[in-house]
């Protein structure tokens, strides 16, 4: 008999000295008529211990803290061995919560347990956005989170409806995923399973062999994220009119058409020599460098005492830089920099082909373009989650929760644990080609480029640049979509900028406009780590380094669970 599945949620008090659950709700994911809303954590946990089901909380990192507090105070201890009256967790080294597995015992060989998962790992969006984008039958409401609610507080009809809507939104969205066969713990795992189903597990193992941890470590040195860079010419200055273009599905586009690695790599010493059977390579290189005049910097060095990890460098500053780079990145380096005292140490070369992901991307692109609501959003998720799974870190050493002397949860690092890597070379080259796409387009617009962020270029002026004018389309895979045109803007640093965007009304909806047809201006604030509440305080006048507000909720572990306390957010 299959296990039942439930969507669950807590509502909690907001005072450090009185941290507790004042309301809970659960709903059967497959039968929405089976649900309950109550006001006692003890009552909820009594149900958890007997239900033997799979439960989903949206942001387990928050709600899970209350559950583990309760378990620790009621005789349960953490154990990885599946002993009766223990619980196990999957909490990453970085503090990401994935699972709580509560073991009650065994009936014969059958484990009697309830497992609690994080639906945020399968649906990485706020509940409000899920309800809207999936076009579900209910929408997220609102309540006064700071209202006084003493122990035994009676839930009002409005609060009851709010809680029911929250659990129903996640229940409906998860059910749609499960009906599509997307039943793994995370969106990335769903993607990888779906890809294996298309090419077969047998072929997957042949095409993407498991590399040794030592070899994977060397490959991983060349793995980097998206290209995010602000042109110093425009930093902290108010800018006039400009345009923003985004690549449609940047990473899937590289997976669809670019030359990508497969198979066992061959280690080589010194400098790579062209090999038509192994046309891709990762090169270990030492050098000094100086940025050429009129070129965008592309070298970023992390984990070094000489350089800032998030800064793209104009010079090696007289130091010898030690780099592992894909041949795609190396090509850009040589074009953008003068390299000195170059020493080619060693490297890895790979067989390569195109089209490995064609059937997978064709399938989900077709679903995306022919569907609406939930299925369309799922297709977007499936298209964008797979590439990262290939570069999953094999070091899965996690954190273990415990109760500190003050009664709050603490976390210690668990025993070292590793798993087989998937195939990191694929992640290296997909992301390298993505950076290449963005950087080459930005470089071709050097006189106009303000800012790049992974899949986007922000330009001065309102003319489509020649480099992309023939590949502008709102939907085509890998084409550049015209995201917006702004009247004025101000950029302070990476992921920190504001814009006045031209908008117009079409069929009762506001859409992006132009200087010629706009009917209104939309003020847009993009700032990593800034809450919506703080964004309402931002103006062109006060948006500068040093802007500060004590309005950012910060989760703090306290006896009983977690409380969000107001912390200071400052633009540095």
UniProtKB/Swiss-Prot annotation:
InterPro entries: DNA-dir_DNA_pol_B (IPR006172), DNA-dir_DNA_pol_B_CS (IPR017964), DNA-dir_DNA_pol_B_mt/vir (IPR004868), DNA-dir_DNA_polB_phi29_vir (IPR014416), DNA/RNA_pol_sf (IPR043502), DNA_pol_palm_dom_sf (IPR023211), RNaseH-like_sf (IPR012337), RNaseH_sf (IPR036397). Residues 56-66 are annotated as: Interaction with the primer terminal protein. The record marks 90 as: Involved in binding template-primer structures. Mg(2+) 2 binds at residues 246-247, 453, 455. 5-methyl-UTP binds at residues 251, 368, 380, 455. Its cofactor is Mg(2+). The N-terminus contains the 3'-5' exonuclease activity and strand displacement ability. The C-terminus contains the protein-primed initiation, DNA polymerization and pyrophosphorolytic activities. Interacts with the primer terminal protein; this interaction allows the initiation of TP-primed DNA replication at both viral DNA ends. Interacts with DNA. This DNA polymerase requires a protein as a primer. This is DNA polymerase. It comes from Bacillus phage PZA.
